[in-house]
UniProtKB/Swiss-Prot annotation:
It comes from Aliivibrio salmonicida (strain LFI1238). Gene3D superfamilies: Arginyl tRNA synthetase N-terminal domain, HUPs, Isoleucyl-tRNA Synthetase, Domain 1. This is Arginine--tRNA ligase. The keyword Zinc-finger does not apply. One of its GO terms (molecular function) is arginine-tRNA ligase activity. Keywords: Aminoacyl-tRNA synthetase, ATP-binding, Cytoplasm, Ligase, Nucleotide-binding, Protein biosynthesis. GO terms for cellular component: cytoplasm. GO terms for biological process: arginyl-tRNA aminoacylation. Belongs to the class-I aminoacyl-tRNA synthetase family.
Amino acid sequence: MNIQSLINDKVSQALEAAGAPAGSPAAVRQSAKAQFGDYQANGVMGVAKRLGTNPREFAQKVLDVLDLDGIASKTEIAGPGFINIFLSEEFLAKQAEAALADERLGVALETKQNIVADYSAPNVAKEMHVGHLRSTIIGDAVVRTLEFLGHNVTRANHIGDWGTQFGMLIANLERIQKEKGEVSMELSDLEGFYRESKKLYDEDEEFAVTARGYVVKLQGGDAFCADMWKKLVDVTMVQNQRNYDRLNVSLTRDNVMGESMYNSMLAPIVADLQEKGLAVESDGAQVVYLDEYKNKDGDPMGVIVQKRDGGFLYTTTDIACAKYRFEELNADRVLYFIDSRQHQHLMQAWTIVRKAGYVPESVSLEHHAFGMMLGKDGRPFKTRAGGTVRLADLLDEAEQRAIALIEEKNKDLSTEEKAKIATTVAMAAVKYSDLSKHRTTDYIFDWDNILAFEGNTAPYMQYAYTRVASIFSKADLSMDNLAGEVKITDEKEKALITKLMQFEEAVQAVASEGQPHLMCAYLFELAGQFSSFYEACPILNNDDESIKQSRLKLAALTAKTIKQGLDLLGIETLERM
């Protein structure tokens, strides 16, 4: 149950009954401090101002008709017109029982939508680097959350698998094959081939002519070029899948929807834009002028959709992409997890999409932008030599550091256990460090903070789960077969249950806003509430059997909630650390 939504609806009804205009926002929020209740309705003051009446007097009118029977034990007016709402212990205990009996922990399914999520998008013939991390793991966390809420989600890995670079790669691979025979098709080799191909393309005109010819042949469906292109894609995606699997990311080869997929749509789209009077010729190119965007002279900005040589641009592909996702995938929402530097480019493409009538306004096109991952020096994260950090190298280093940390913390574990724990902690640490930050901000990547067992980190959250689970393993009890009823005998119990009952609010916020850090913040607060409860409220050594059983239920619900929350982030838990 989403308690915030429940109360918001009740307050909205009361506002209207008290004379507020229909649709006036109740603005119900979780209270920042316990002294202000569990929830606070902040919408009264805005309505009172519009009505020209005293806010506190209007708040009283709202309270007079507010029906929170069976939900709140107390309501009060505070400050200039806030309404503080204190949840009843009986209501909370009942909700906790229901959540514990439900494998979904009380989280309701939403009305199903078709949602397309565009994320990760590495380039073919290049290894994934740290710049791909954010899109990959943020997108995957949101996708997992949307699926948990019952939505039909199509993962779209929009890989860079088309363009002039394939002409020079194919030409160079053919040259080397003629000299040396079959070429080893490892991605690390292709990285070297790529650099060599670029050098040849820039310095050898004969090679450049051949490469450009192969681009034309590839676009025309030439069998040799198509076969070589497919090999490049296959080798790249095999390597990328290793990274996805290590990171517990749910993308597979079946989710690849690369740039090449839209090739056949580009010319018809440009022709259609011309027919609709949107695309016009300018210096031999086809350009769409947008009044919504101005150049430095204040004139409508021109967006090129076809170059004078007949070639198409990323914008054209993105127009086709949005069109396809609505027409063929029946999308209700399309989410793009692409860095913030691409924002204007996407907005321009979508403006054209709307003007052309390819995607109606009822379909939400959303750019979930993100900031950069920075080194300790505040600059883009690089190797010591100043090069790009390969994602696989970052994950290797995370595992090495985690093994050293675990050997220091727990020398009694077997070598096999240490390796398993190190891998799980390492991948979780890299992911959680990123996911716990607000998506739109840049953040500093610092190994010491990432692997710390204190603060809002993966090791802390994994240990928090292990700590709760150990209560049951020590007592040889199952979390799924607990007797008795939940009862509240201490303020710490009430605070813990209140936080547990806000899980659905966190889940829905991640799904609607595309902000995984909201789940991280929730789980960190939940772990803190459990620590306070655990210190103040004895569990296994409690003399009152009914209180002992009740507290075991709260511990079980806490463990299950942390485990489920971390799972939505793509992070595994451990029974022992």
